């Protein structure tokens, strides 16, 4: 298993290279998932935990007071200030031409500011080319795509043949598709792919919620191939102190990563 540093030097995607460099520099494989509906609160929490994360995962369409100038521009400033990247968890799932417009147009203009986004494989490989075209037409900055191979929710249909087919779609573009949302390693190294595995549903304290979320521990997911742990309510839910929890998850994630090499 290659180190983050080695992967930052060898990866085919500039987005992945930068992400691995940040992870190595900050000693963090923590992605903060902030499902927060008010801009001020979103930015405030992000500013406090920014030093401890490599990535923030947003759901920009739940921000009720969203404006491009008031939400996106300060978000980008915080990413610059604290040296983390931005992942908009849009989960595109339509035909190529439609997702192309969803990605670059509308009120959110995701392709302009999100380093990384993600998509379901359900509509086939056209989704990858549609999103890539949108990125190329929108910005000169590099963009990366994650495919949703597996989900952490109870009763998810994303497993088995569906997961295998999604992996095949990912192989259609080595530079733009940088990895997967998945629960374990997706292989591919023998064919020259170096996929980043990001795993949601990671918690040190909770086992799940009433809406079907199932949590796994940091050690458990990193041991099975996760590169980046995605933590949401574990950082700020139930009256938790975001700074204290961000430090805790950063340390747990980094220690689990170092244990890979023992």
Swiss-Prot record:
Superkingdom of source: Eukaryota
The pathway entry for this protein reads as: Pyrimidine metabolism; UMP biosynthesis via de novo pathway; UMP from orotate: step 2/2
Recorded hits in InterPro entries, A to Z, give:
Aldolase_TIM, OMPdecase, OMPdecase_AS, OMPdeCOase_dom, RibuloseP-bd_barrel
Keywords carried by this UniProt record: Decarboxylase, Lyase, Pyrimidine biosynthesis
Give the active-site positions: 91 (proton donor)
Question: Where is substrate bound in this sequence?
Answer: 35, 57-59, 89-98, 215, 233
One GO MF term, please?
Answer: orotidine-5'-phosphate decarboxylase activity
Q: Does the keyword Lyase apply?
A: yes
Report the sequence similarity comment from the record.
Belongs to the OMP decarboxylase family.
Q: What is this protein called?
A: Orotidine 5'-phosphate decarboxylase
Look up and give the organism this protein is from: Pichia kudriavzevii
The coding gene here is URA3
């Amino acid at each position: 298993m290659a180190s983050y540093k080695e992967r930052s030097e060898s990866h085919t995607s500039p987005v992945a290279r930068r992400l691995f460099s940040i992870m190595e520099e900050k000693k963090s494989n923590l992605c903060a998932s902030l499902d927060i509906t008010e801009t001020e609160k979103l930015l405030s929490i992000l500013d406090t935990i920014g030093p401890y994360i490599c990535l923030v995962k947003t759901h920009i369409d739940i921000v009720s007071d969203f404006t491009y100038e008031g939400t996106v521009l300060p978000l980008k400033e915080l990413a610059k200030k604290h040296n983390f990247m931005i992942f908009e968890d849009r989960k595109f799932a339509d035909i190529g031409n439609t997702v192309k417009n969803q990605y670059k147009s509308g009120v959110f203009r995701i392709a302009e500011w999100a380093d990384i986004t993600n998509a379901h494989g359900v509509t086939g490989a056209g989704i990858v080319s549609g999103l890539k075209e949108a990125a190329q037409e929108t910005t000169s900055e590099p963009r990366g795509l994650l495919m949703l191979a597996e989900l952490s929710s109870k009763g998810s249909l994303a497993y088995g043949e569906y997961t295998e087919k999604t992996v095949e779609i990912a192989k259609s573009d080595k530079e733009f598709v940088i990895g997967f949302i998945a629960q374990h390693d997706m292989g591919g190294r023998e064919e020259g792919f170096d996929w980043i595995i990001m795993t949601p549903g990671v918690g040190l304290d909770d086992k799940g919620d009433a809406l079907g979320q199932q949590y796994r521990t940091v050690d458990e997911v990193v041991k099975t191939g996760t590169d980046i742990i995605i933590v949401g309510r574990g950082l700020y839910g139930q009256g938790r102190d975001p700074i204290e929890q961000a430090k805790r998850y950063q340390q747990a994630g980094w220690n689990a990563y170092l244990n890979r090499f023992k």
